[in-house]
From Swiss-Prot:
Name of the gene: tmk
Listed name of the protein: Thymidylate kinase
Cellular component annotations (GO), alphabetically ordered: cytosol
GO biological process, one term: dTDP biosynthetic process
Species assigned in the record: Teredinibacter turnerae (strain ATCC 39867 / T7901)
Keywords: ATP-binding, Kinase, Nucleotide biosynthesis, Nucleotide-binding, Transferase
Record-linked Gene3D superfamilies: P-loop containing nucleotide triphosphate hydrolases
Example GO molecular function: dTMP kinase activity
Amino acid sequence: MTGRFITVEGTEGVGKSTNLAFIEGFLRSRAIDVITTREPGGTPLAEELRELLLAKREEPVDACAELLMVFAARAQHLNQLVAPALARGQWVLCDRFTDATYAYQGAGRGLSLETISKLEFLVQGSLQPDITVWLDIDVRLGLERARARADLDRFEEEDVSFFERVRAGYRARAEEAPARFCRINAGQPLAQVQTDIQRALEAFL
C-alpha cells in the first residue's frame, strides 16, 4: 500500500514548525505511521545543500544557481527518503516542497515558471502531494514574527515586496490546484489555526 504525502507551505513567520508538530501528533493519534521531514534538507547531503542555500554571504547568489541548488537537494531527498517511505506505506509530512519553489524562485525571484516545471518533471515525475496545508498570513505580520528571532537566514532578510510576490505565487498555486490546497488563516490565534488544520485533515482522512 502506498503512503500519503502531506506538505505544509507558507511564507516566513506563519508558524510552520509549531503546526508541523501539531499535524504529526494528530496523525500519530490516528495510528498513522508518519515521517516528518523538510525541504531543502531531509538527508545529510540535502542538509548540506540547505546550508549553502540559506547562508548569508558577500557574493550575490544568482537566482538560477539558487533554483538548481533547491532541485539538487530535492532530487536527493525524494530518492533517498520520500519515495522509499511512500513505497513502504508510510505517510510523509514535509515542511515545504515544490510549491515553495514556484513561490520563492518563480514569483519571488522572477524565474520562468516553465523552467521550474521542466525541472519539477525531471526530478519528481508525476509525484505530487496528496494535500497541501497552506498557512497564509499578512506578509508584514509574518515578517514581524520571523524577525523577532535573533538569527535570520538569507531569505528572511529579503524585503516586504519580495514576500508579497511570494505570497501571490502561493495564491496562484492554490488557484491552480484547489482540490489539493487547503488555505489556513495563520494570522488567527494558534488554537483556532490548529482547529482549522485538524478540520481539514479530518476531511482528508
